[in-house]
Amino acid sequence: MLVATDADWIYDEVDAALGGADTSVLRVRRGVDVVPACKQVEPALVVIDLQIGNMGGMAAATAVRQEQEAGRLADSGVIMLLDRHPDVFLAQTCGADGWLIKPLDAFRVRQAAEAVLGGGTWFEGLPGEGEDVEDPVADVTDDPEATADDPAGGGDDSVVAADAR
């Protein structure tokens, strides 16, 4: 496994959760080093911190996916480590198989890694079930009189409905 972070505490947390006798957790401290490290060690999983120095985590994850799609890099799972819920919007654009929102804990890191390594996904901070994953922000209006049937707000006393798509 490869962890891309310049924060020691993040590497320590991921290593403690995923490292072991049969699993080595390698580290790069700069986003620009992620693709070359992936070419060298061919990790099954790449964990990328959003706030990595030099080249941001989103750019590093996108670069990994582009190299994989071009056939210049072996397939591997990609998990992003996000700082806050609004970062989910950014994470959706980079092709990650999953993401966790900090602060981290070993249990969630293991769950996410197992899901992604098993061919699945792991996403935190998305809307509830049945809602569109591609657009987590529901359409809203500033007009308190507006409803789903009357978005312009004509004084109807019905409850405002969120667009769950």
Tell me the role of every PLM-derived stretch:
Residues 1-18, 46:
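Conserved acidic segment of CheY-like receiver
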Residues 29-45:
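Acidic, metal-coordinating helix/loop segments flanking the phosphotransfer/catalytic sites
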Residues 42-44, 69-77:
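His-Asp phosphorelay/catalytic-motif detector in bacterial-type signaling
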Residues 44-66:
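Conserved phosphotransfer microenvironments
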Residues 46, 99-100:
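Two-component signal transduction core modules
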Residues 59, 80-98:
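Alpha4 helix (beta4-alpha4-beta5 surface) of REC/receiver domains from two-component response regulators
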Residues 104-113:
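C-terminal output helix
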Residues 114-129:
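The C-terminal output helix
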